[in-house]
């Protein structure tokens, strides 16, 4: 599905442009979905919660390209779109799965609990 992989970079760009506060972004993409759907142990950095985190560099500038897209569709409506603010590392269940724009381990996800 186009747009999933580009959601965070595009929204971080809005934060850098003053259109969105980082606290609001965290609520929108982390906390609110888990609260809305009643997903347990996700969405917050808290003791006994799953260690699912994304580390971002708010100063990193990137031009989004179709060849960066990992989804099966292989394209993005944001092709050639320049963003400032980019994820540099993703941690799933405490394991680093993406670092410096390279997948280093496939996610070892677990079923969600509601």
PLM region descriptions:
Residues 50-102, 106-111:
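C-terminal cap of metal-dependent C-N hydrolases
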Residues 1-59:
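His/Asp/Glu-enriched, well-ordered alpha-helical/loop segment
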